[in-house]
């Protein structure tokens, strides 16, 4: 766990933070493998006359994408569990007036294609369950005070051959300057020996030597939603063992004014709001065009196809879409791209690509946030769609709808038969405030 060693030493001299050494194992609830994680961010939530959110900060991390057991790396670790993969990191928690009733740490995992997950951890689980402090003796404290970057042998001992060679070691040229090779100087039957200084055996050890032999306590904790597991590591030699952490209790009146689930509640309220606005926008667009819409996607349908069913499919597709709306939705990803591009960010889509939510009305399921490519057929000016792991255009599937949103917030709600309701979604100041708070896009 060199990552924990490095940051434990770094934050010790930086001061003002508590190093929370954690490992994120491969979990069935995560959307992808741990080696697919592109970046990690964290923020803290503290009580300061209300819920106070710190800014998002980027974390450096190490990925172990193989089977690993803590005892194979740390011989005195108290865990025998085998993990199929780990993400190793250290979260620097600022030292403030802690209120363990509601204080928390939010860990954001960013995957390819704007897929992300947030893990909310209680500060109490990260700090207060640590083992009791065992102050090292004065001798051991002196031994580990050296720079851990200095490399030494494990036992600091020399073999007899090495000690013998040291006796004949001398600085200077290999041969005296006046020696002519091939001639034997008279009177010099034996080579002149210059004994080197007496070899002094090193007895001091270094933090890098003792770090992997110390006692380590590993404990699994669950996040706020009881969904994800995180392993917290407490090291015997970590400087945090000597830190005095105080908990400030909240009064009954203060507890009534705060909500420990504020992070999720604000997100769910916004999802309900934007989902309702998208559906309202689709209905108003249909009314503006006098309930007429054109075929935009290449799709064959039977002669006895009933156009009266389209409005029923539209209502059914809207219900399925908003029922389980998540932050992986195409409208969320499109807004992230739109605001990020305005702030000088890069484009996540090619010119012929959009974000899409694919709605299967026959199963009542939705695939959110797919990257969709539009292919124009010049013979009929109709589009076909293509995506990974899909053999044919989504519009060719029976009883299926789709919502497509471009990076310019151009919106298409596609009904069976390839008919589309087209418009452009407009942002409000509330949208910008939410995305700045939730994703740090300011």
Swiss-Prot record:
Compartment annotation: Virion; Host nucleus
Pfam families recorded: Herpes_UL17
Gene Ontology CC annotations of this record: host cell nucleus; viral capsid
Membrane spanning stretches: none
Domain of life: Viruses
Gene Ontology biological process terms from the UniProt entry: chromosome organization
Keywords tagged on the record: Capsid protein, Host nucleus, Late protein, Viral genome packaging, Viral release from host cell, Virion
Chief subcellular location: virion
Keyword Membrane: no
Family: Belongs to the herpesviridae CVC1 protein family.
Oligomer and partners: Interacts (via C-terminus) with capsid vertex component 2/CVC2.
Physiological role: Capsid vertex-specific component that plays a role during viral DNA encapsidation, assuring correct genome cleavage and presumably stabilizing capsids that contain full-length viral genomes.
Protein name (Swiss-Prot/TrEMBL): Capsid vertex component 1
Annotated organism of origin: Human herpesvirus 6A (strain Uganda-1102)
Gene name of the record: CVC1
């Amino acid at each position: 766990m060199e990552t924990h060693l490095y940051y434990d030493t770094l934050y010790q001299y930086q001061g003002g933070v508590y190093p929370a050494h954690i490992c994120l194992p491969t979990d069935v609830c995560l959307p992808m493998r741990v080696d697919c994680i592109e970046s990690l961010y964290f923020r803290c939530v503290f009580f300061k006359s209300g819920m106070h959110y710190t800014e998002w900060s980027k974390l450096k991390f190490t990925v172990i994408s193989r089977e690993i057991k803590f005892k194979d790396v740390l011989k005195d670790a108290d865990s025998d569990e085998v993990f199929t993969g780990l993400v190793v990191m250290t979260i620097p928690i600022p030292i403030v007036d802690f209120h363990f009733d509601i204080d928390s740490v939010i860990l954001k995992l960013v995957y390819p294609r704007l897929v992300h997950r947030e893990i909310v951890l209680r500060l109490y689980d990260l700090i207060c369950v640590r083992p009791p402090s065992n102050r090292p003796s004065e001798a051991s404290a002196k031994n580990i005070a050296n720079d851990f970057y200095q490399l030494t042998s494990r036992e600091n001992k020399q073999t007899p051959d090495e000690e013998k060679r040291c006796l004949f070691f001398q600085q200077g040229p290999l041969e005296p300057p006046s020696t002519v090779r091939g001639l034997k100087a008279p009177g010099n039957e034996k080579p002149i020996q210059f004994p080197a200084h007496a070899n002094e055996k090193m007895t001091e050890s270094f933090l890098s030597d003792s770090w992997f032999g110390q006692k380590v306590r590993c404990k699994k904790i669950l996040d706020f939603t009881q969904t994800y597991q995180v392993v917290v590591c407490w090291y015997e030699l970590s400087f945090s063992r000597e830190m005095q952490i105080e908990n400030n209790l909240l009064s009954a009146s203060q507890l009534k004014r705060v909500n420990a689930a504020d992070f999720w509640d604000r997100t769910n309220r916004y999802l309900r709001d934007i989902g309702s606005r998208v559906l309202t926008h689709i209905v108003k667009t249909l009314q503006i065009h006098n309930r007429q819409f054109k075929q935009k996607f290449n799709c064959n349908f039977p002669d006895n196809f009933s156009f009266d069913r389209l409005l029923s499919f539209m209502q059914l597709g809207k219900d399925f879409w908003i029922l389980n709306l998540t932050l992986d939705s195409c409208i969320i990803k499109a807004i992230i791209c739109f605001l990020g591009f305005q702030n000088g960010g890069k484009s996540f889509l090619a010119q012929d690509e959009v974000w899409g939510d694919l709605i299967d009305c026959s199963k009542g399921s939705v695939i959110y946030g797919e990257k969709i490519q539009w292919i124009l057929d010049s013979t009929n000016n109709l589009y076909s769609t293509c995506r990974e792991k899909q053999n044919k255009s989504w519009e060719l599937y029976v009883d299926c709808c789709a919502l497509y949103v471009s990076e310019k917030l151009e919106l298409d709600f596609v009904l069976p038969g390839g008919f589309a309701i087209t418009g452009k979604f407009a942002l409000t100041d509330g949208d910008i405030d939410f995305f700045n708070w939730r994703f740090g896009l300011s």
